[in-house]
Amino acid sequence: MPTVDSSIACANVLIEAQTCLDIHSSAEYVVNDINCILSQMIAPDTSIDEALTVMRLSNKKSTLYVGTETKLLGVISSFTLVSRVVLMIANRKRVARSELTVADVMSPIYKMPALRKNNVHRACIGDIKKTMESLGKAHIQVVDDTNKIYGVISSIDVSRVLHEPVYINATAHSFKDCFNVMPEHEELI
């Protein structure tokens, strides 16, 4: 019986299938199912260092889901946890890095773009990659017809199965985004 790769345990990608997937493969292969996500969440008040330890000890090298037992609040990647984004947020909040929690640096679910489950069913992985790159978002939620979260797609999982990077460039989508970076000449996060 095939097993699921532990680093993308929630995705529908079997180890044998990973070598066969390409940009024309069904996007359903990279959707992380909400039922699996809910069983692997960490609390929003978890420190950044604790989250890194959880990733290391659980062989979960790419993405952690943040929330309560029944509600997904956000997503955080290992890349974010070790990037300068953490220091920028600490500086912006005027706190020490050690005082930040995953809630401070996660990508909140309410800011994630959403795709309908039936659209993802018709899409290929290449479509998802282009969507992420054009939106400048590393995570996309998948919702059903009632807007209930069905799953999440992570650029790290897309990159892993395609064996090529997904280029995510932060993009200002509102005047508030522009205004927030102007006083300190910071980057978008």
Predicted regions and their residues:
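Tandem CBS (Cystathionine beta-synthase) repeat/Bateman regulatory domains
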Residues: M1-I189
